[in-house]
């Protein structure tokens, strides 16, 4: 027998009361986005489950994709069949025969939500257990901690049989907690911050600053590859490329070296906030970790934050670098993050950046700039690209291949 579908069990969604179906429908849409590379797949949801019909598609890559989607508590490959006692008996016998080995223990666990079905749960457990003994007389039944728990569900539309329960990613479906702008540089920390924001249901749009010719096409492709990795957790992501060359050259030419980083980050924050307002986001997310670098001391954060009243979420702020690296490796962004492409935060980095910049000094130096004009030109020059989970070679790999 081949699996018919993957049955998805919802996580925290069961606690959402009147909003439950809104959360479930969002999860369904996210699953459809993530599984877009598999055109034969169909997805439907009810209040208790989401059903991913395989329609002949190999189940293993579907399971691997679904395990990453936030809002999924658990999933099971299942056999779907008509609600017929003879069909159930044959299916249970075939499945257990395929799983049998010496010493194997099992139990049948039946759940009947269709109360019009001819047998109740207790009767089905007895009948199907007896059917297993008919073909496997040496198998042992065990009610506590058996090797195999064969779950049989009798629902209104069909019967379902499964024996695997695979842990999902948990969290909330992406998009159920509003929208935020993720400042993604291309380093290790910001993709991890994005992952953690996605886990709590935040719909992120990625803001990436590019300063050609100081930053290369490879740096841009790297940021897009990182964004593509994040689409595995909740579907498509809007990637916003911000032209930043003019501003960086202005800062380099007119500001004291010690304040280059502070002023650069203040402009980035202003621009991100303007994009957030334009695109109806609610928060800004970044990968700052307290004390990790000069721009991430409390004094620096205070001086940079002063340009906006928008909430700033810093998911990795209390994490050690090694903890962030471990998470980056777990979500498969680390190898991309360490590719040796420059970013806007490093190209004009001073040898001795100010670790305790004074807000008054930053504001005084900014009097040398046409702040509104610079921000407006940057925002008007953004390029928005929708990044999807399609199975393609990484952009950076394509670029390297082209060069070779």
Swiss-Prot record:
<feature type="binding site">
    <location>
        <begin position="183"/>
        <end position="184"/>
    </location>
    <ligand>
        <name>ATP</name>
    </ligand>
</feature>
<dbReference type="GO" id="GO:0002937">
    <property type="term" value="P:tRNA 4-thiouridine biosynthesis"/>
</dbReference>
<dbReference type="InterPro" id="IPR054173">
    <property type="entry name" value="ThiI_fer"/>
</dbReference>
<dbReference type="GO" id="GO:0009228">
    <property type="term" value="P:thiamine biosynthetic process"/>
</dbReference>
<dbReference type="GO" id="GO:0140741">
    <property type="term" value="F:tRNA-uracil-4 sulfurtransferase activity"/>
</dbReference>
<dbReference type="GO" id="GO:0004810">
    <property type="term" value="F:CCA tRNA nucleotidyltransferase activity"/>
</dbReference>
<feature type="domain" description="THUMP">
    <location>
        <begin position="60"/>
        <end position="165"/>
    </location>
</feature>
<dbReference type="InterPro" id="IPR049962">
    <property type="entry name" value="THUMP_ThiI"/>
</dbReference>
<dbReference type="InterPro" id="IPR003720">
    <property type="entry name" value="tRNA_STrfase"/>
</dbReference>
<keyword id="KW-0784">Thiamine biosynthesis</keyword>
<dbReference type="Pfam" id="PF02926">
    <property type="entry name" value="THUMP"/>
</dbReference>
<dbReference type="Pfam" id="PF22025">
    <property type="entry name" value="ThiI_fer"/>
</dbReference>
<feature type="binding site">
    <location>
        <position position="265"/>
    </location>
    <ligand>
        <name>ATP</name>
    </ligand>
</feature>
<dbReference type="InterPro" id="IPR020536">
    <property type="entry name" value="ThiI_AANH"/>
</dbReference>
<dbReference type="GO" id="GO:0009229">
    <property type="term" value="P:thiamine diphosphate biosynthetic process"/>
</dbReference>
<keyword id="KW-0547">Nucleotide-binding</keyword>
<comment type="pathway">
    <text>Cofactor biosynthesis; thiamine diphosphate biosynthesis.</text>
</comment>
<feature type="binding site">
    <location>
        <begin position="208"/>
        <end position="209"/>
    </location>
    <ligand>
        <name>ATP</name>
    </ligand>
</feature>
<comment type="similarity">
    <text>Belongs to the ThiI family.</text>
</comment>
<keyword id="KW-0067">ATP-binding</keyword>
<dbReference type="GO" id="GO:0000049">
    <property type="term" value="F:tRNA binding"/>
</dbReference>
<dbReference type="InterPro" id="IPR004114">
    <property type="entry name" value="THUMP_dom"/>
</dbReference>
<feature type="binding site">
    <location>
        <position position="287"/>
    </location>
    <ligand>
        <name>ATP</name>
    </ligand>
</feature>
<keyword id="KW-0963">Cytoplasm</keyword>
<dbReference type="InterPro" id="IPR049961">
    <property type="entry name" value="ThiI_N"/>
</dbReference>
<dbReference type="GO" id="GO:0005524">
    <property type="term" value="F:ATP binding"/>
</dbReference>
<keyword id="KW-0820">tRNA-binding</keyword>
<dbReference type="GO" id="GO:0005829">
    <property type="term" value="C:cytosol"/>
</dbReference>
<comment type="function">
    <text>Catalyzes the ATP-dependent transfer of a sulfur to tRNA to produce 4-thiouridine in position 8 of tRNAs, which functions as a near-UV photosensor. Also catalyzes the transfer of sulfur to the sulfur carrier protein ThiS, forming ThiS-thiocarboxylate. This is a step in the synthesis of thiazole, in the thiamine biosynthesis pathway. The sulfur is donated as persulfide by IscS.</text>
</comment>
<dbReference type="InterPro" id="IPR014729">
    <property type="entry name" value="Rossmann-like_a/b/a_fold"/>
</dbReference>
<dbReference type="GO" id="GO:0052837">
    <property type="term" value="P:thiazole biosynthetic process"/>
</dbReference>
<protein>
    <recommendedName>
        <fullName>Probable tRNA sulfurtransferase</fullName>
        <ecNumber>2.8.1.4</ecNumber>
    </recommendedName>
</protein>
<dbReference type="InterPro" id="IPR050102">
    <property type="entry name" value="tRNA_sulfurtransferase_ThiI"/>
</dbReference>
<keyword id="KW-0808">Transferase</keyword>
<keyword id="KW-0694">RNA-binding</keyword>
<dbReference type="Pfam" id="PF02568">
    <property type="entry name" value="ThiI"/>
</dbReference>
<feature type="binding site">
    <location>
        <position position="296"/>
    </location>
    <ligand>
        <name>ATP</name>
    </ligand>
</feature>
